[in-house]
């Protein structure tokens, strides 16, 4: 299935494709059906970001006649879990309606990381504390406080070296003539891949498919996993050095820590503090005027103190929570 996504930050349409052939098919369809002549930019890797340790974030939004403060804990989750939301906040400290609003606001946004601006994934975001004002709090105030709290948590984690860049990995099965096996193993090692012992000989039984080994008719099979960023047009390279007898099969294996994160981060040149729609800073009020407080200084200005003794058992932000049970 073709993956299509709009990048608001880059103002670009991103396509998730499996190779040059599919790209040409898409180009042809756009021309035949809609009369569009479309140029495609060079392919890029879909990186993601996560955390390696929990990080508490505080967001405060208090321009004149507005008020909201939210404390959200962002902590690492199991690989492949996406972004999970819940609460440990006592209803004695913050009314359930405000808690629902905070978590609804958190769930509506596609949060991005602070290393490259890549999507945030594999984290659990938990509401731990907050405060509203009986007169001045409006719904949009908590939206601003919530976004800033998540962002402030990520910036704190970044300052401690606890942000992790993730990259996609492919599970591969590479069939090559036996006399080209050394070349194939060398290539996969150079790419940072990992693989089991190759096998050559009779064709593998159906039960062995995917076990990482098998061969037939002088064709050896090498199976393992490799970073997607290293593959490029390797399928074409395989066809070239095997005289058309080689075959490379790929399947997405998931995301793992990026093997060359420093290079990717440097090339991205992403400045999280310059990304104003995702600001980590908060807004406080003094003498009738709002003023901005940088993310590093927000905890010292916060109106609510984090008290672990007030936390309740974790509850997911699911249909029962929003339904009033």
Per-region residue spans from a language model:
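Accessory interaction regions appended to the cores of large information-processing enzymes
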Residues: 1-325
């Amino acid at each position: 299935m073709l993956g299509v996504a709009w990048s608001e930050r880059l103002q670009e349409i991103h396509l998730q494709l499996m190779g040059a052939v599919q790209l040409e098919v898409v180009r042809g369809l756009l021309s035949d059906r809609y009369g569009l002549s479309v140029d495609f930019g060079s392919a890029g890797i879909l990186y993601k970001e996560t955390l390696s340790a929990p990080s508490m974030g505080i967001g405060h939004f208090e321009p004149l006649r507005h008020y909201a403060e939210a404390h959200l804990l962002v902590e690492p989750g199991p690989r492949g879990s996406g972004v999970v939301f819940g609460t440990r906040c006592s209803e004695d400290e913050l009314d359930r309606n405000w808690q629902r609003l905070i978590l609804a606001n958190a769930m509506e946004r596609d949060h991005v990381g602070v290393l490259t601006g890549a999507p945030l994934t594999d984290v659990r975001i938990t509401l731990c504390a907050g405060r509203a004002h009986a007169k001045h709090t409006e719904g949009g105030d908590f939206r601003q406080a919530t976004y800033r709290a998540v962002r402030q948590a990520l910036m704190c984690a970044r300052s401690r070296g606890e942000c992790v860049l993730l990259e996609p990995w492919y599970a591969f099965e590479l069939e090559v003539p036996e006399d080209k096996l050394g070349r194939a193993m060398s290539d996969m090692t150079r790419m940072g891949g990992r693989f089991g012992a190759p096998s050559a000989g009779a064709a593998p039984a159906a039960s062995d498919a995917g076990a990482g080994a098998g061969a037939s008719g002088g064709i050896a099979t090498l199976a393992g996993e490799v970073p997607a960023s290293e593959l490029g047009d390797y399928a074409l390279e395989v066809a070239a050095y095997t005289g058309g007898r080689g075959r490379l099969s790929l399947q997405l294996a998931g995301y793992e820590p990026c093997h060359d994160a420093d290079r990717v981060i440097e090339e991205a040149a992403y400045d999280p503090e310059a990304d104003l729609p995702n600001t980590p800073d908060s807004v406080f009020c003094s003498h009738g005027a709002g003023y901005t407080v940088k993310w590093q200084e927000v905890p010292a200005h916060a109106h609510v103190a984090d008290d672990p003794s007030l936390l309740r058992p974790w509850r997911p932000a699911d249909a029962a929570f929003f339904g009033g049970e």
